[in-house]
């Protein structure tokens, strides 16, 4: 048994446990609680680095029903990176006391990934979570999750980077996610990807495309790339929550 929590700052180190369910031997890693993968804090950096460098087989995002919009910021960022994603909407019992409910099937349809409602304290929903997790793990392939659409200039810059990234056939990281990290010039993360030989940033075709993408973005006279990404994700999260959450 591990004592963990799903609020930001609760877990300060990774807690690891194992269990067997539905024919799967699972190793579960509880990452530091965070609302973002932007690596502005130690918790965010640990969570982000684990997801992109350790490449888990699946990622379960545990959300609080009472602040779903804020939690969806993290979910949408994570879905750009991970290939197998499940979303757990927790504390349904507490939400019910406050008059809060979530249309779980609608949220699942919007995100394109399994969504499970839970009240972890009473273990309500735990069996469904394990069953759907194992189904994902045993499937040869799963549909890719929803992609956040950014502004047209940013999307054009991404399109310039995708062919040379895909030509490298990077293992364990998604080409679109790598392109976005290059566009926001996340030097520390890009160095880690290079050190792990997950992406060859010095490849001539990639360098040429990167320069073209930079020039395109510089000519648009828009806010910094990271700010544009965050704004799009926050807007998408808010609109999703407004669509599926009912509250007094």
Feature map (PLM): residue ranges:
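Conserved G1/Walker A P-loop phosphate-binding module
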Residues: 1-42, 52-54, 58, 80
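Conserved C-terminal guanine-recognition region of P-loop GTPase G domains, centered on the G4
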Residues: 17-23, 45-116
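Short, surface-exposed acidic/glycine-rich loop or hinge patches that mediate macromolecular interfaces
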Residues: 34, 65-68, 120-123
């Amino acid at each position: 048994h591990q004592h963990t929590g799903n609020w930001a700052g609760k877990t300060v180190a990774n807690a690891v446990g194992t269990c067997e369910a539905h024919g799967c031997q699972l190793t579960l890693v509880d990452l530091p609680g965070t609302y973002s993968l932007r690596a502005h804090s130690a918790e965010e950096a640990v969570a982000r680095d684990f997801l992109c460098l350790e490449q888990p087989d699946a990622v379960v995002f545990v959300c609080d029903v009472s602040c779903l919009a804020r939690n969806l910021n993290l979910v949408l960022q994570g879905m750009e990176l991970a290939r197998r994603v499940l979303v757990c909407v927790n504390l349904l019992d507490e939400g019910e006391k406050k008059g809060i409910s979530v249309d779980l099937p609608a949220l699942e349809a919007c995100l394109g990934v399994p969504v499970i409602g839970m009240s972890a304290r009473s273990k309500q929903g735990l069996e469904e979570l394990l069953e759907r997790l194992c189904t994902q793990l045993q499937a040869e392939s799963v549909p890719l999750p929803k992609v956040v659409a950014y502004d047209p200039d940013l999307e054009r810059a991404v399109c310039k980077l995708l062919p040379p990234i895909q030509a490298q056939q990077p293992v364990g990281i998604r080409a679109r996610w790598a392109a976005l990290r290059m566009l926001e010039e996340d030097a520390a993360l890009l160095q880690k990807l290079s050190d792990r030989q997950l992406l060859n940033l010095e490849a001539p075709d990639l360098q040429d495309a990167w320069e073209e993408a930079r020039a395109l973005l510089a000519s648009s006279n828009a806010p910094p790339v990271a700010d544009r990404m965050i704004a799009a994700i926050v807007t998408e999260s808010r609109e999703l929550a407004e669509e599926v959450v009912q509250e007094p």
